Amino acid sequence: AFGAQFVFTVSAHYSVREGKSDTSKAPNHLPWYDWDSCEEMVLPNKCKLVGVELIDDAIELPSFHHPKQAAYVLGPEMGSLSKEMIKKCDYTIKIPTKFCINVQIAGSIVMYDRIRSLGKFAQRPQTEVEQKDD
């Protein structure tokens, strides 16, 4: 979904390929990288790493200009990105919420924001548009 070109994990504590919640069966359609540590990560040339983390100095998602070539990394469910991973990130962004949200929801929000901001979609109207009756 959302035009992803590859998927990766770092220090995963489970087998992604056996995940029950992946209804799209991503490992069957996308290149998949499993790295044991941040040091082993090798992203494509010119690819910016964007961390998604609820920290004070992160850029709020609505203000973030997504790089055209980017990989997004999210922390584990009920956890956070490691300090090493945050240091490796070119940018750190946050979804402006008052509390943490499910990692799958966070990933979907970020990727939707990316496709919306980089896509060639028409501008939204400034006022409510009247709906046509069927």
Model-derived features with residue positions:
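Post-transcriptional modification and biogenesis factors for structured RNAs
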Residues: 1-134
